[in-house]
Design a protein with these regions (language model features):
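Intrinsically disordered, low-complexity, charged terminal extensions of DNA damage-control enzymes
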Residues: 1-37
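A general boundary/transition motif marking the beginning of the first structured unit of a protein
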Residues: 10-14, 38, 54, 87-90
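Alpha-helical ds-nucleic-acid-binding substructure associated with the helix-hairpin-helix region
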Residues: 19, 54-55, 59-131
């Protein structure tokens, strides 16, 4: 229900400030509900990194190939063979670096959704900002 309160707040604020066109648009669009990803946290962050600065179609194609590699991944640390698979999937050197920083990060691997939800906004920010490619 929080999304409905956010919608009402934005609508009321636009009216208060005299932004009638914006208020009408907010009213017309209605409340937006954000869906929570069902992916594990590491996969979710990996998909976000891959999708940065790409067209939707390119990101989807590269993610499909990368997701397959990740699901088959039995590696315990970064290595040349895995990096080559990522490169063949269409990832740049920099994105491979970022992806390795996520998939081999023990803190990310071990954290639960419950722990993430318990974090304050500042704690969550600090937790994510330390990760290369996000921070």
């Amino acid at each position: 229900m929080e999304y409905k309160l956010a919608h009402k707040f934005l609508y009321d604020k636009a009216v208060d400030k005299g932004y009638i066109q914006l208020a009408n648009h907010i009213k017309k669009v209605g409340p937006l509900k954000i869906k929570v990803s069902k992916m594990d946290f590491v996969s979710h962050l990996s998909k976000i990194i891959i999708g940065q600065q790409l067209s939707v179609q390119s990101a989807a194609a590269i993610w499909k190939r990368t997701d397959k590699i990740l699901k088959e991944n039995k590696y315990k640390k970064e290595n040349i063979k895995l990096n080559q698979k990522f490169k063949d999937a269409g990832l740049s050197r920099q994105k491979i670096e970022y992806l390795n920083g996520i998939i081999f990060n023990k803190d990310l691997i071990n954290i639960s959704k419950k722990e993430l939800k318990r974090m304050s906004a500042a704690e969550y920010f600090d937790f994510l900002i330390q990760i290369k490619g996000i921070g």
